UniProtKB/Swiss-Prot annotation:
GO molecular function: asparaginyl-tRNA synthase (glutamine-hydrolyzing) activity; ATP binding; glutaminyl-tRNA synthase (glutamine-hydrolyzing) activity
Catalytic activity: L-glutamyl-tRNA(Gln) + L-glutamine + ATP + H2O = L-glutaminyl-tRNA(Gln) + L-glutamate + ADP + phosphate + H(+); L-aspartyl-tRNA(Asn) + L-glutamine + ATP + H2O = L-asparaginyl-tRNA(Asn) + L-glutamate + ADP + phosphate + 2 H(+)
SMART domains documented for this protein: GatB_Yqey (SM00845)
Organism in which the protein naturally occurs: Chlamydia abortus (strain DSM 27085 / S26/3) (Chlamydophila abortus)
PROSITE patterns listed in its UniProt record: GATB (PS01234)
Xref: Pfam families: GatB_N, GatB_Yqey
Known role: Allows the formation of correctly charged Asn-tRNA(Asn) or Gln-tRNA(Gln) through the transamidation of misacylated Asp-tRNA(Asn) or Glu-tRNA(Gln) in organisms which lack either or both of asparaginyl-tRNA or glutaminyl-tRNA synthetases. The reaction takes place in the presence of glutamine and ATP through an activated phospho-Asp-tRNA(Asn) or phospho-Glu-tRNA(Gln).
Protein name: Aspartyl/glutamyl-tRNA(Asn/Gln) amidotransferase subunit B
Gene that encodes the chain: gatB
Length: 487
């Protein structure tokens, strides 16, 4: 990156739209379900029929309150709905019902790890609103699918407290993990259950000025988010450098962009609207939403262990490396799998490495999640225990892991019974003979080792393991090799 760019910093905030996994929509009894035939999950309310009146979904409120408790925000005892007016084909009423002035949650924070450092990203608010429909384009015309119209959302608005793409991705990743843990959304980003609008401005380092921001709409990939933020950061810096004497407000006007992943650039959609352009006013067909402290406390007590708390526990209780703990807690199903396996295997570090490296790699190739692969946590625990007990070598364990992926119902013990030829080499006289052959075949390595080049020992061990097809116990190979070399 140019040194000129290094003199600037980004100021980033995120608005995240999260579809709540209720059975019905926010203000009607129409089904809330993705993937059905277009315009089958609709009602007079979500299609804006005259005379239809909204009725608030109680479960959506409960899920919004649960989120507020999870982020340690202030859940409002009194909140209110407003109309946000805009005209677009996917909005049949020509307004959205949202919470403009009195949101259900204010404040709170998302805990994340950025480059090994604990960070608390502050939230401004979270409010309840309904989603719009979807435009589907077919060549020269477009159709409107209102199945999504009226689906309950919470919009989570952060403060402008992030200063680089890594901050934003860490925040977004931690937020999705939190949503998954508390179970208020299916968090399927490919289906649009979580959509990120990213706001970014730039300023010279050391400045406290907040310049005009640009919004990049509907990011549904962490990788695209990082790319878009870096591209937009460079675009804005270039614009300011090209116009050093101009008023910053005229150099970068407030606008909405989208990310073009093929061209690797942000593309202008429209100039930014002002709040007054939406003509907000109180929703006349819904009463004030009134909650009680007892109701909020009841919901707070249903919170599970949250990902960041679990992360800290894994560091202390299991003594895991920070990066391994972060991988395990990122998905609640993977964390649960690890904890079940850890009940039967006390070599937690080896167990976690097998889960996050060996089995994770195999599952990725097959497009599976280990937690749903059919492999039992006890089977993975048994595999690691067998290595520690010297029943099998690491090479044999990898072969068994391959077989477990193909036959997930089989434990390592069962696989070894069915394939006794996989058992490690136990005939020490045969092993000593192989060691002698390797020593004879590699005289230079022997000379190197005896002259103090310790890497030569590793080479000799590798040759022995190759000759035994990985079936010789590595520790015993080392011991016997040293004995033979000392002769």
């Amino acid at each position: 990156m140019s040194d000129v760019y290094a003199d600037w910093e980004s100021v980033i905030g995120l608005e995240v739209h999260v579809e709540l996994n209720t059975k019905s929509k926010l203000f009607s009894c129409a089904r809330n379900r993705f993937g059905d035939e277009p315009n089958t999950n609709i009602s007079p309310v979500c299609t804006g029929m005259p005379g239809s009146l909204p009725v608030l979904n109680k479960e959506a409120v409960r899920k919004a309150v649960l989120f507020g408790c999870a982020v340690e925000g202030e859940v409002a005892l009194l909140s209110r709905f407003d109309r946000k007016s805009y005209f677009y084909p996917d909005s049949p009423r020509n307004f959205q019902i949202t919470q403009f002035e009195h949101p259900i949650v204010r404040g709170g924070h998302i805990k994340a790890i950025v480059h090994g450092e604990e960070r608390h990203f502050e939230l401004a608010q979270a409010h309840i609103e309904d989603d719009a429909g979807m435009l589907k384009h077919f060549g020269e015309f477009a159709g409107v699918d209102y199945n999504r119209a009226g689906v309950p959302l919470i919009e989570i608005v952060s403060k402008p407290c992030m200063f680089c793409a890594d901050d934003a991705v860490a925040y977004a990743t931690a937020l999705v993990s939190l949503l998954d843990y508390i179970g208020i959304s299916d968090c399927n980003m490919e289906e649009g259950s979580v959509r990120f609008d990213v706001n970014i401005s730039v300023r010279p380092k050391g400045s406290e000025e907040l310049r005009n921001k640009v919004e990049i709409k509907n990011m549904n990939s962490f990788a695209f988010m990082a790319q878009a933020l870096e591209a937009e950061r460079c675009r804005q810096i270039d614009a300011y450098l090209d116009n050093p004497n101009a008023d910053p407000k005229t150099v970068i006007p407030g606008a909405t962009y989208r990310w073009d992943p093929e061209k690797k650039k942000t593309v202008l959609m429209r100039l930014k609207e002002r709040a007054e352009d939406y003509k907000y006013f109180i929703e006349p067909d819904l009463p004030v939403l009134q909650l009680t402290e007892a109701y909020i406390d009841e919901i707070r007590h249903t919170l599970p262990e949250l990902p960041f708390n679990k992360y800290q526990r894994y560091l202390h209780e299991y003594a895991l490396a920070e990066d391994i703990a972060a991988i395990l807690i990122s998905d609640k199903h993977s964390a649960h799998f690890f904890e079940l396996a850890a009940q039967e295997c006390k070599n937690y570090r080896a167990l976690s490495n097998w889960l996050t490296v060996e089995f994770a790699g195999r599952c990725k190739l097959k497009g599976k999640n280990l937690a749903f692969s059919g492999i039992l946590p006890s089977s993975v625990a048994q595999l690691v225990n067998f290595i520690d007990q010297g029943v099998i070598t690491g090479k044999i364990a990898k072969d068994i892991a391959d077989m477990m992926m193909e036959s997930p119902e089989k434990s390592p013990e069962t696989i070894l019974k069915e394939n006794p030829e996989m058992l490690p080499m136990t005939d020490e006289s045969a092993l000593v003979a192989i060691i002698s052959e390797v020593i004879t075949a590699n005289p230079q390595s022997v000379v190197d080792y005896k002259s103090g080049k310790t890497k030569a020992l590793g080479f000799l061990v590798g040759q022995i393991m190759k000759r035994t097809q990985g079936k010789a116990p590595p520790n015993r190979v080392n011991e016997l090799l040293l004995v033979e070399l000392s002769k």
